[in-house]
Amino acid sequence: ATKQETDRAMAGFLKRLVPKKFRKEGVVIPVVRLQGAIMASGSQFRPPLNLATAAPALEKAFAYKDAPAVAISINSPGGSPVQSRLIFQRIRDLAAEKNKHVLVFVEDVAASGGYMIALAGDEIFADPTSIVGSIGVVSGGFGFPEMLKKIGVERRVYTAGTNKAILDPFQPERESEIEYLKSLQLEIHQVFIDMVKARRGPKLADDPDLFSGLFWTGSRGRALGLVDGLSDMRSELKRRYGPKTRLELVSAPKGLFGRKSPGI
């Protein structure tokens, strides 16, 4: 038996020693919701999902001493790979530090960076119609050199360093710049692929499209090994920990003027 299983068995034994009238009925599972586009910064009208906004609630949830697990609900189309990986790592660090099982539940979507965060789960569940995957890297923008010519505007750029103005949208693209950008994308993509392989391992199907950037429904994602089961949070937690299990939504503590305090 694992240490976690031994601890649970011991906790159950000790609980039975307490007179029934003094026992707390049902297991309490802390729930953290991670939703929205993953960005380093945003606005009060469109709050971002990043480590600073996610960390306080995560720290609070993993501090539930008697909870055997932490449930994380994810609803994100992705965004910054850096912030995605930082959130992933914080969840794994807390899980190891507090000895908690992590159950991830995908709502509408956990794609790209959203799926990267989902990899922090020891188990991943999704709705059959959820969207999962999109294991790839994309970047884009616009170019305006011809427009400037038409309106009679001359672009003047002065640099110290031959590549300081690389990918300037007001200058024609150069093949060398495109190749450099692609090399960065490939490097980031490989980090993502390595994370998926490390976390999902032998569960993954041998499918050539798995790391192509495609996305799938939860049902197909299960067949590909991207998710472990098709279920909703409430049903799965009650099935696992008993019908009296209570789900407790955890949010970031509020600071001065009622604003949520950012974490680090």
Regions found by a protein language model. Name each.
Residues 1-127, 138-264:
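N-terminal organellar transit peptides
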Residues 131:
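Short glycine/proline-centered loop/turn elements that form peptide/ligand docking sites
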